[in-house]
A protein has these predicted regions:
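Conduit-forming functional cores of very large proteins
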Residues: 1-191
Length: 191
């Protein structure tokens, strides 16, 4: 029924303690609640599944009443001190990965810091690559912002005709580095 589909979609969005090994998790993207709590009230289904001892959310004291005489529809007012102490605080964990492919003709990708004087097409400027180490990987625990490069990689041209089209005198490479999405920022957890 549509109601079952709706409920399963809502359950997938719920936060809590999904795995005790979150740093070793293989999920590409995942949300984590920072201060999950064991539920105060449980159901028979939770007891049968053995979930009564697992932190699955946060216990909040809720009052349903008009706020200062105004009937605000679809609004929630939180206590500022509760939010300051971590109520509802979560973090988002995203995995970035890249692989070095081998192409016909013996050409292959290289993990490196792209250089402006190495005839690299699509070079993004030294500021973007400032956090990379010599092997092309970012330094552990670096603070990154949108546009920063996480994995430095160069690739051969896609088609050999590109040599003739752009009248390149020597072999050039393309910058295919992996970067942080423009709207995101964060800290590198592990490499």
């Amino acid at each position: 029924s549509p109601r079952n589909t709706y409920e399963s979609a809502m359950a997938k969005q719920s936060l809590g303690f999904s795995t005790p090994l979150m740093n070793a998790s293989t999920y590409v993207r995942q949300h984590f609640m920072l201060y999950p709590q064991i539920p105060v009230v449980t159901t028979k289904a939770i007891n049968l599944l053995g979930l009564e001892d697992r932190p699955t959310g946060q216990n909040c004291i809720v009052a349903v009443l008009p706020f200062e005489g105004y009937n605000i529809e679809d609004a929630v007012v939180f206590n500022k001190s509760s939010v300051d102490r971590g109520l509802g605080r979560t973090f988002f964990y995203r995995v970035y990965e890249a692989e070095a492919k081998q192409y016909p003709g013996g050409m292959k990708d290289k993990f490196e810091i792209p250089s402006s004087d190495a005839n690299i097409r699509g070079y993004r400027g030294e500021k973007s690559y400032r956090l990379l180490e010599d092997d092309g990987a970012i330094m552990h625990e670096s603070i990154v912002n949108g546009g920063d490069i996480l994995i430095g990689r160069t690739s051969p041209p896609r088609f050999m005709e590109e040599y003739k089209e752009f009248e390149v005198k020597g072999p050039y490479r393309r910058d295919t580095s992996i970067g942080v999405r423009p709207s995101e920022n964060g800290v590198v957890d592990s490499v």
